[in-house]
């Protein structure tokens, strides 16, 4: 079962253990060296210059869905933040078809972005299902205040290695490629990042159909159940040239 951390237990830890427990991951977002065609194939030369992909981790053992690997890479340039997901999936499913449908109930890949870490509780959410349908919002308190937000100019492409909503066969997986123009972050950050800037983010995946459904995630939110909306536990994106 997913570990639940109790404050009373910290006295039993070695001096360095608490620091290690609370650390968040860091990813260096390289500048794209060539144009990126957002087609879901992830075969542009620019992706070869990205830092090695992060692999999302499984933290909640009470979930019964299959543990299917997800790897994520990121790049940036003067126009946008680029995100590439590669998700193993033996049964690709997605029912929702309209913008701002609850895509998180489908097979979905997500990125949460906070461009101003001084405002720890605020972040943008981009959640895309295997059909390429986007649910986006601006969250102000990490629990209940999800503000309607419609990003503009976002490029989205998925590529399926299998068939959608066909449970009788076995699929291999799917990829998602995103380009999010910097203008979409202006409410929290008036200018694009520069080399050396640090933003906060988390990368998540919802996979499977209830009751066999599982979440995987980049940065551990230290929650006893699968809840990714903990901006104080987001990992760090460091923009580099």
What are the residue ranges of the model-derived segments?
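Hydrophobic h-region of N-terminal signal peptides that target proteins for export
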Residues: 11-20
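Structural preference for beta-rich elements and adjacent junctions enriched in aromatics
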Residues: 21-241
